[in-house]
Amino acid sequence: MGTRAQARFVRVTPRKARRVVDLIRGLPAEEAQAVLRFAPQAASGPVGKVLASAIANAEHNDKLDRETLVVSRAWVDEGPTLKRIRPRGFGRAFRVNKRTSHITVEVAPRDTVGAASAKRKERTR
């Protein structure tokens, strides 16, 4: 089990945030930060903040070295949807859904991530 950080109610659609999270899953933490820094997607900002928070939590709370950390798990859940009205012609109104996300990133030391995935592979065989 690694160290987690979570950002809730982030005003980015879950579908777009998942595209960014898929880029960093399984990468070393330093490399994942570099990937996010140069990713053109708008969701890379909030995901980068969550990753930085997870790294800081691991360093401060668990006394882990940031060079050994790997993004072991990362996922995006759907938050509540803000419903807005857009006025249209002839007195009509269309609904605009402003979606929110809950972004979670978990980092763990490199040696524990490899052992856990090996155990999972043995169980599935």
Swiss-Prot record:
InterPro entries: Ribosomal_uL22, Ribosomal_uL22_bac/chlpt-type, Ribosomal_uL22_bac/org-type, Ribosomal_uL22_CS, Ribosomal_uL22_sf. It holds the Pfam family Ribosomal_L22. The keyword Ribonucleoprotein applies. Keywords: Ribonucleoprotein, Ribosomal protein, RNA-binding, rRNA-binding. Belongs to the universal ribosomal protein uL22 family. This protein binds specifically to 23S rRNA; its binding is stimulated by other ribosomal proteins, e.g. L4, L17, and L20. It is important during the early stages of 50S assembly. It makes multiple contacts with different domains of the 23S rRNA in the assembled 50S subunit and ribosome. This is Large ribosomal subunit protein uL22.
